[in-house]
Amino acid sequence: FCDLGTLYNADVLDVQEDESGVIWHKINKPVETGIKVTGRIDWNRRFDFMQQHSGEHIFSGLAHTHFGATNVGFHLGLESTTIDLDVPLSEENISFLEKEANEAVYKNLPIEISYPEKDELALLPYRSKKELSGRVRIVTVPGYDICACCGTHVAKTGEIGLIKITSFQNYKGGTRLFMLCGKRAYLDYRRKNADVLRVTTSLSVKPEELCSGFERLSSEITEHKIY
């Protein structure tokens, strides 16, 4: 996803770079030719993507370190993020990685950007999905991940706020994970907590008794069911 925002009084709808390196902005209405304009980025959107992307770096780096997993697919959507790893992971494995990823958040580590020289780059154990040449941008989360990446990231891990794996599934012999970070994770928790409170109020049980309350209700329904 590109950044959105405004140029002068026009909304930016899309941004593309052509083969010659020229950046083109698609806007919703014409701007007078020859005038100097000010561009403003939609910061809420940008920061949201930075949180998701930075969280993915930490989780993927940990998966690589602890389970030898390679990130073979990453999709950053408007509502959720998916990570495809090339090894099967158990629920216990994923719970461990999630816990360790959030430990990295709590440490509020600096996320470092560098452009190593060719000789130095050859010695770095960095992650990359393809062979790279020329000037390579390296993103490092000290102790957690070193990755070649041209994306946007938060300045410190604490800005991610929270990393939560909401679900996972077997995928092409590996594992597909669904992840929420930062404000997305908070809003997801707030919605689900509200749902839990509504259900537990109806069942007259405490939130921590939801499962047992549901099982009791299900059993009562089964006992009184007329066939």
Predicted stretch roles:
Residues 1-7, 30-83:
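Active/ligand-binding-proximal structured segments within catalytic/core domains
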Residues 7-22:
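Solvent-exposed beta-strand/loop surfaces of large extracellular or lumenal domains
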Residues 20-29, 81-87:
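A generic structural motif
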Residues 25-34, 180-182:
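Short solvent-exposed strand/turn elements
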Residues 61, 95, 99, 103, ...:
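Solvent-exposed alpha-helical segments within well-ordered globular domains of core cellular machineries
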Residues 160, 166-227:
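Terminal appendage regions of diverse proteins
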